[in-house]
Amino acid sequence: MPHSSLHPSIPRPRGHRAKKAAFVLLSTCLAALWELGEPADHILRWLVLHLASEQLGLLFKGLCSLAEEIRHVHSRYQGSYWRAFRACLGCPIRCGVLLLLSCYCYTFLPNTAGLPFAWIVALLGLSQALNILLDLQGLAPAVVSTVCEQGNFNVAHGLAWSYYIGYLRLILPGLQARIHTYNQRHNNTVRGTGVHKLYILLPLDCGVPDDLSVADPNIRFLHELPKQSADRAGIKGRVYTNSIYEILENGKPVGTCVLEYATPLQTLFAMSQDSRAGFSREERLEQAKLFCQTLGDILADVPESQYCRLIVYLDAAEGSSFSLSQEILKHLKQEEKEEVTVGTMGSSGVLESSTLDKEPQLLISGMDQPLPLRTDVF
């Protein structure tokens, strides 16, 4: 299930609108300079000089960062000063080229301000020092979020992969066999192909009670599936269990399914309650959305996705009339409709192919003489 269909509030991955806006800004500035009537060579000279100043300032900033990283060269860079240098200043060839280009621009291009080269370098160093001390060039939250998403540095990314690799990938392949074993013992309690899945609840507010009946009294625990055991990380016969719940409507059972919360959301909630984690409520909501997005993207590319269904919801956004049991019933009915549609399309395709695959048959009349095509001769 793609993340865009999980819940309307889950954000899409960031695109390239910032670069498009930069292109519009570039065009606007070029048009403004053209209207001002400045000579093209004069504009180009100042542009190159300004870019050289910015790059030289970034080199100064990188050197200040290098002073801190040298303290951690053994713990962070395995004792390699070269790796610490590259981490702060990037490619050394690029740094050398930019430094030579900056020196060339300041030496050979006309200096309209009349300042010596040493003065310009000192002013650049002064400005970068003030930027670092006063944090004048701190990254905006949107920039930090973009960097974390593009580099997969978010807490939610690690939690989603851990949840899939350490849990879902282990239990989902054998889930239908365990449900079949359970049905043999309990007179087919879990009926219908649509319910032979693991329904995973994903509340975006990370409210994960240990008892589902606390979240909604119309969700009633029924039984446990047969246990599954596996050797994991030195633990012999680690046991995995799943629970079957009955969904009630007007006091009567109307559905049965294997149901549970995604436990990493409970971790996010606990982090937001612990001041040592430095995790605000807004950050928790953002990470919960990214967790659902990442988990949906992971499951979209693996065969185990056919054995589970994600139910994403947000109580506050849905209003006070929101009912978790009704939300689960909606997904159960939708799952059945999808499977009926797929089954109907498959059967019609089989019928068509079987009809077309038949050998052609000759229809031979029992009359001695052939009949004309016209009917007015009789």
UniProtKB/Swiss-Prot annotation:
GO cellular component, as recorded: autophagosome membrane; cytoplasmic vesicle; endoplasmic reticulum membrane; endoplasmic reticulum-Golgi intermediate compartment membrane; Golgi membrane; mitochondrial outer membrane; perinuclear region of cytoplasm; plasma membrane
Record: residues binding 2',3'-cGAMP: S162, Y167, R238, T263
Catalysed transformations (reactions): H(+)(in) = H(+)(out)
UniProt motif (pLxIS motif) ranges: 362-365
UniProt keyword annotations, A-Z: Cell membrane, Cytoplasm, Cytoplasmic vesicle, Endoplasmic reticulum, Golgi apparatus, Immunity, Innate immunity, Ion channel, Ion transport, Lipoprotein, Membrane, Mitochondrion, Mitochondrion outer membrane, Nucleotide-binding, Palmitate, Phosphoprotein, Transmembrane, Transmembrane helix, Transport
Main location class: endoplasmic reticulum
Protein name: Stimulator of interferon genes protein
Originating organism: Rhinolophus ferrumequinum
Gene transcribed to yield this protein: STING1
